């Protein structure tokens, strides 16, 4: 089921993410869940803890909302950049739609889809007609870049649940894309040759041969990384949720789908927990805590083989390096409610 590191004499899973820090072989860590449950705060905090015990860590946001810049109060882009105050923790934010646009729209920076010739436009239409191709290309480009940068551990702050799970199918998506393009080029080869110059150039200056070579390179990279994703020594997925029905439902669906893809998951972070003091006269707090406890009990019963980390609801936003560092401590040292 999982490779969580626990002592043989333990009769339960530790309620922390310490096992992830201890598992030195891990290279890819995904943090995902329903929107608004604290994925970004959790992924940033986990990255901070990992940076203490790893040579180099890269945090990548694949969520179009791009909250990393907000979390660290520092602007990030599509190039990896060191986070202020760290010498071994970098971050980057990628546009899920950007990579395929770059690949298909020609070489010039100002060349958009509107400048493309008929065949180039047809290629773009074909590419976008394949479900999930935008995310697939985006991740392929990132993975290619990550490979050349040789970070010890890479953490993905993923888009909300549906997008995350769709991304995990991207190796087969790209395989299908390449098959379709190859089929078209064989079917319409003579026709395409009429449009192309002697060096394979389309009317808009695009080079079809170069584009096909680039796709093939990406496919090889994706195939290699896909094998790593299914290796529990190298990859794990951290589920983030809050103690409410919809979030619990999404988490269960996600864990089942991760299992079907062969991707390891053995950690759940439950955010926004209320801990009213005994005898508190706050009726709303007590009522909400009762509801939360019902779902928290279900989580602990359903996932008794998981590291379930309980994180408190805080009185202020977790933004900036200092607050994130403080929050991150609770991922490795269980929170003790004030008595």
Swiss-Prot record:
ATP binds at residues 34-41, 244, 271. It is found in: Cytoplasm; Endoplasmic reticulum. GO terms for cellular component: GET complex. Its EC number is 3.6.-.-. Pfam families: ArsA_ATPase. Zn(2+) binds at residues 282, 285. Keywords: ATP-binding, Cytoplasm, Endoplasmic reticulum, Hydrolase, Metal-binding, Nucleotide-binding, Transport, Zinc. GO terms for biological process: cellular response to oxidative stress; pheromone-dependent signal transduction involved in conjugation with cellular fusion; post-translational protein targeting to endoplasmic reticulum membrane; response to heat; response to metal ion; retrograde vesicle-mediated transport, Golgi to endoplasmic reticulum; tail-anchored membrane protein insertion into ER membrane. GO terms for molecular function: ATP binding; ATP hydrolysis activity; guanyl-nucleotide exchange factor activity; identical protein binding; metal ion binding; protein folding chaperone; unfolded protein binding. The active site is at residue 63. InterPro entries: Anion-transp_ATPase-like_dom, ATPase_ArsA/GET3, ATPase_ArsA/GET3_euk, P-loop_NTPase. Belongs to the arsA ATPase family. ATPase required for the post-translational delivery of tail-anchored (TA) proteins to the endoplasmic reticulum. Recognizes and selectively binds the transmembrane domain of TA proteins in the cytosol. This complex then targets to the endoplasmic reticulum by membrane-bound receptors, where the tail-anchored protein is released for insertion. This process is regulated by ATP binding and hydrolysis. ATP binding drives the homodimer towards the closed dimer state, facilitating recognition of newly synthesized TA membrane proteins. ATP hydrolysis is required for insertion. HAMAP family: Asna1_Get3. Homodimer. PANTHER family: ARSENICAL PUMP-DRIVING ATPASE ARSENITE-TRANSLOCATING ATPASE, ATPASE GET3. This is ATPase get3. It comes from Neurospora crassa (strain ATCC 24698 / 74-OR23-1A / CBS 708.71 / DSM 1257 / FGSC 987). The lineage of its organism: Eukaryota, Fungi, Dikarya, Ascomycota, Pezizomycotina.
């Amino acid at each position: 089921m999982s490779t969580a590191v626990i002592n043989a004499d333990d009769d339960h899973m530790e309620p922390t993410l310490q096992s992830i820090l201890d598992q030195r072989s891990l290279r890819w860590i995904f943090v995902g869940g329903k929107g608004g449950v604290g994925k970004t705060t959790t992924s940033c905090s986990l990255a901070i803890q990992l940076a203490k015990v790893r040579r180099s860590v890269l945090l990548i946001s694949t969520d179009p909302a791009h909250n990393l810049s907000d979390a660290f109060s520092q602007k990030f882009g599509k190039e990896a950049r060191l986070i202020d105050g760290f010498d071994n923790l970098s971050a980057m934010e990628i546009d899920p739609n950007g990579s395929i646009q770059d690949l298909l729209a020609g070489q010039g920076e100002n060349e958009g889809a509107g400048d493309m010739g008929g065949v180039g436009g047809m290629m773009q239409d074909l590419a976008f007609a394949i479900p999930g191709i935008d995310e697939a290309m985006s991740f392929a480009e990132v993975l290619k870049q990550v490979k050349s940068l040789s970070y010890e551990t890479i953490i993905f702050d993923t888009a909300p649940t549906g997008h995350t799970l769709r991304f995990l199918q991207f190796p087969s998506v790209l395989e299908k894309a390449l098959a379709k393009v190859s089929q078209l080029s064989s079917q319409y080869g003579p026709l395409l040759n009429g449009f192309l110059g002697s060096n394979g150039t389309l009317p808009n200056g695009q080079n079809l041969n170069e584009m096909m070579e680039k796709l093939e390179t990406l496919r090889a990279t994706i195939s290699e990384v896909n094998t790593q994703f299914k290796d529990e020594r190298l990859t794990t997925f951290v589920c983030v949720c809050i103690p409410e029905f919809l979030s619990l439902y999404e988490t269960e669906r996600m864990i089942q789908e991760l299992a079907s893809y062969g991707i390891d998951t053995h950690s759940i972070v439950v955010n926004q927990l209320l801990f009213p003091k005994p005898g508190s006269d706050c009726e709303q707090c007590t009522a909400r805590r009762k509801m939360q406890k019902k779902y928290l009990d279900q989580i602990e019963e359903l996932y008794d083989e998981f590291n379930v980390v309980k994180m408190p609801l805080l009185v202020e936003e977790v933004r900036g390096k200092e607050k994130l560092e403080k929050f991150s401590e609770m991922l490795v040292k269980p929170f003790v409610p004030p008595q």
